[in-house]
A protein has these predicted regions:
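Domain-level signature for soluble enzymes in the chorismate/prephenate branch of the shikimate pathway
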Residues: 1-268
């Protein structure tokens, strides 16, 4: 089965995808991946969702709101960054914005005056550095090639750097069993105690939240929706009670969307 993920070849998403299949198809944005999986063009995709240093990947969260999908699995992968260039002389460092941010301390300490150039992926940054000797790239150390040599390894700000990825599928593939469940809540209203009510309904059922994040709805300033991950299966009676209460809490124009249940895999 083909897996859709962020390209070009060599991205961290690509490396995670190879754990599932050798049949990989690339897109140049997370939004394109989620759209093509949501409408059934592809049966499976892999996207980055959250990094242990820089937090959530905002494009991924926005895409999960805009397109209906199922989460089949969560994959946690270690992220090790290296600085690669054709020589030790360059005037620009490029990579995906998340990678640049994850190596902020290294860049500030060693190259405070160089230009930082965002790329669509770590792999596309590697391609730029391969073509242009004035550019260095941040990416996986195995991205070195005949033109690019490794100038420094493990340059991420934290040695425990890791990223969560979601394996996604069309919404008809949602699962009821798994270690965790994800839900998106859009109250489309704002009043004192709203967030407390949402959190209390989980606490009343003794359900542990592993992540809660508010994101702008895009409709107007101050209007938010919530991404919540929690430790329970969709088919548990306590989860069904939570969903019932959440539907009651949101206004008539709001909505609650479960993305299904899934297990967690840790890669080494």
């Amino acid at each position: 089965m083909s897996i859709l993920t962020l390209g070009p070849a060599g991205t961290y998403s690509h490396r995670v995808s190879l754990s599932f299949s050798d049949d990989i198809v690339f897109r140049n944005s997370v939004t394109a991946i989620v759209k093509d999986v949501s409408d059934g063009t592809f049966d499976k995709g892999i996207i980055p969702v959250e990094n242990s240093i820089e937090g959530s990947v905002t494009e991924s969260l926005s895409s999960l709101v805009d397109h209906d999908i199922a989460i089949l699995e969560e994959v946690v992968a270690p992220i090790q960054h290296a600085l690669l260039a054709q020589s030790a002389t360059f005037d620009t460092i490029t990579s995906h914005p998340q990678a640049l941010a994850q190596c902020r301390n290294f860049i500030t300490s060693n190259y405070p005056d160089l230009k930082l150039e965002p790329a669509t992926s770590t792999a596309s940054g590697i391609d730029r550095a391969t073509e242009d000797d004035s550019i260095a790239a941040i990416g996986h150390p195995e991205s070195s090639n005949e033109q690019l040599k490794i100038l420094a390894k493990n340059i991420q700000d934290q040695s425990s750097n890791s990223t969560r990825f979601f394996v996604i599928a069309p919404p008809t593939k949602r699962q009821k069993l798994g270690e965790k469940t994800s839900v998106i809540i859009y109250p489309k209203s704002d009043y004192s105690g709203l967030l407390l009510k949402i959190l209390q309904t989980f606490a009343d059922q003794d359900i542990n939240l592993t992540r809660i994040e508010s994101r702008p709805s895009g409709n107007k300033l101050g209007d938010y929706l919530f991404h919540i991950d929690f430790e329970a299966s969709s088919d548990e009676s306590r989860t069904l009670e939570v969903f019932s209460n959440l539907h009651t809490i949101v206004s008539e124009n709001g909505w609650v969307r479960s993305l299904g249940s899934y297990n967690v895999t840790h890669l080494s």
